[in-house]
C-alpha cells in the first residue's frame, strides 16, 4: 500500500504543532506579515485549497462544493486591505480560480481551452530529445560577451520549472566576471563571462511548514536543469 513518507522526519506532536499554528493565524497576523511570505501563502493556499479541486471537478464535469473558494476569497480581501496591486500574478491567479469555482458550483463547465498545451509535432519531439541528449557539463568557457536578452531567456526557462506547493521560492543573481573578477575562484567549475546563481527566498517556505526540507533541493534542482537545457538550446 502506498504511504506518503514526506512527513516522516517530524514527530506526530511536531506535525500537530505546525497544523495548529497555521490554523491559528489571525487576520491581524496575515495583514502584518512580511509581504513575501503573505504572497507565498496566497499562492500555496490557492493551489492546495482551490486549484487542485477546481481542475479535478472541471475535468469530471462535476459540481464543486459551494464553500470551496471561501478561504481564497478571504485571502484576496486581505490582499486588498494590504493595498497590494490587482495586476500582480497571485491576485490574477486566485481570481481566475474563484471565477472558475463559481461556475462549477452552478454546474457550469469551465472553458480551459486557452490553456490547452500546444500539440507536439514529430519535429518538436526530435528537437527536444536532441537538446536533452546533447547537453553537456561544460568545463571550459570563452570570454565571449553574453547579452542580457540571452540571459533573460535562459532565466525565464528556470522560472517555468516545477516548484513544490507553488510557493515559488527561486531567485537569481547574475554576476558578470568582468564586474566581479575572481568572485567564484575556487569553485570546481572554471570561471566564465557570466555566473548564474540560483537562490531561494526561505520566507516562501513558511507558507507551508509541512514542506519537507528535501523539497528545497528539488525546487532548486528543477530550476537548474531547465536553465542548463535552455542555455544549450539557445
Language-model features: where?
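Acidic, surface-exposed loops and disordered segments
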Residues: 1-234
Amino acid at each position: 500500500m502506498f504511504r506518503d513518507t514526506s512527513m516522516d522526519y517530524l514527530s506526530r506532536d511536531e506535525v500537530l504543532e505546525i497544523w495548529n499554528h497555521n490554523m491559528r493565524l489571525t487576520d491581524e497576523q496575515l495583514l502584518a506579515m512580511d509581504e513575501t511570505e503573505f504572497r507565498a501563502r496566497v499562492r500555496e493556499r490557492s493551489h492546495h485549497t482551490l486549484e487542485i479541486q477546481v481542475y479535478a471537478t472541471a475535468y469530471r464535469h462535476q459540481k464543486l462544493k459551494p464553500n470551496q473558494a471561501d478561504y481564497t476569497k478571504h485571502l484576496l480581501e486581505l490582499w486588498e486591505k494590504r493595498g497590494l496591486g490587482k495586476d500582480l500574478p497571485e491576485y490574477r491567479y486566485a481570481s481566475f480560480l474563484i471565477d472558475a469555482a463559481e461556475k462549477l458550483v452552478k454546474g457550469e463547465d469551465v472553458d480551459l481551452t486557452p490553456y490547452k498545451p500546444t500539440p507536439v509535432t514529430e519535429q518538436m519531439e526530435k528537437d527536444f530529445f536532441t537538446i536533452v541528449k546533447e547537453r553537456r557539463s561544460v568545463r571550459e568557457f570563452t570570454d565571449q560577451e553574453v547579452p542580457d536578452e540571452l540571459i533573460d531567456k535562459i532565466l525565464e526557462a528556470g522560472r517555468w520549472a516545477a516548484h513544490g506547493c507553488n510557493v515559488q521560492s527561486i531567485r537569481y543573481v547574475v554576476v558578470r566576471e568582468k564586474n566581479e573578477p575572481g568572485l567564484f575562484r575556487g569553485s570546481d567549475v572554471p570561471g566564465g563571462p557570466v555566473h548564474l546563481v540560483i537562490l531561494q527566498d526561505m520566507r516562501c517556505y513558511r507558507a507551508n511548514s509541512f514542506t519537507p526540507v528535501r523539497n528545497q533541493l528539488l525546487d532548486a534542482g528543477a530550476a537548474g536543469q531547465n536553465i542548463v537545457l535552455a542555455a544549450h538550446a539557445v
